[in-house]
Amino acid sequence: MPSHLARWTGLAGATLLALSAFLGGAFPAGPLRSTPVSIWQGTNGPLILAAWLVGTGLMAYAWWALRDGGPSTRWALITVGLWMLPLLIAPPFGSRDVYAYTCQGASFAGGISPYEQGVSALPCPWLETVSPIWRDTPAPYGPLFVLIAGAVVKATGSLTASIVLFRALSLVGVVLSAWALPVLARRAGVPAKRAVWLALGSPLIAAHLIGGPHNDVLMLAALVGGLAVVASHPGRPGMLLVGGLLLGVAVAIKSTAVVVVPFAALAATAGPYRIRTLIRDGGWVVGGAVAAVVGVTVAGGLDFGWVGGLSQGGAAVAWTSPPTAVGQTIGYIAALFGGHVDALPVTRGIAVVLLAVLLVWLWWRARTRDPLYYAGLALAVTVALSPVVHPWYWTWPLFVLAATARRTGWFVVVALVASFLVLPNGIGLPRFTKTVGAPLMTLLVIVVVIWLVRSARAARQPVATD
């Protein structure tokens, strides 16, 4: 597809997404328990669904068509900016999380720790806008985001103004990412135009990080910013400390970013890997990250009770999480024989152990390879083995791999598929496709495992020589 055609195709798709948001987005007074059928049967239902699916499809096609990069970085940035214009003025869509952000901010502003009680404890003046699952659940976010949410509510005092400010903050995250991604890409030997296009042009960014809006883009901006600073100044203590502080900011927004810190420490070393240089150079990165997290926690008066609150995100059950899908499938098979098996605690527990092993293994391999690329892989396995996987979680590895992977590959396909899993009012299609989705995901897990085992065996085979 010619680049100019891709630009206008994506803009048409973004305009259709905005139309579907105005007709059936995640409005404050919207229904909290709708289904695809109830949307179809409601006012403008067919138009809402058609605009959403066609719009997502157009954006996805344009993004995929130029997955190896457009004409230039400047062209990519201008195109992404054009695509975001209609979305910035649309009501929230693709998720209702912004209402939970606002109520958690109201709780904190009211003197209640959102890590100890749900938003119903205040109660939040906009409680009816929050999905029931989050009303009595502690916040699963880091202390910095709680501080930000509290400041937003204090500054605005209204729900609408808070949503506008949250979306503005998401836009700031996109702008900061637009600076950091080319820097990180150049250090990794990846075309900057491709990195910007893959990371910021993805439909996941439009439909979730901006449309939601979601706080993930703030975490990602600090994350890629920290990696860019570290990769650009190996062996320089002052700049490594700055990079570590940025990574700590990312962790203080969403704790998932912590898996990147050990890889950033490797990237900080000047010259070949040695334990001495790792301690000398990587220590500045780790120290900066720890200082940022501790500083924000103490400044917010939250102590470290927020660490326990981070485990609250696993209440949802959806087949988009591979370990959850395997557990669901085991239960379905048992039901065929008249049994009842709740395998979720087992499969999720195994996934946690496997994740720990894989992270250590990836770090060990990264010592003599590209730690920046392996940081992206670490985020990918973290998402894949999490007990709950929302579609926008795949933006985490997407941002890093877009700037560090030498070839576009599976991560682009995953992001493409994930773009179609949520409807404009925020309901997730996996909720209504469990009996089909879970077995299919389980089958995919089996196929991937077999492929990985065969690839590992092939890599060990000696190369024949004449």
Describe these PLM feature segments.
Residues 316-347:
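Membrane-lumen/periplasm interface segments of multi-pass, membrane-embedded glycan/lipid transferases
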Residues 1-312, 348-466:
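Multi-pass membrane glycosyltransferase architecture that uses lipid-linked
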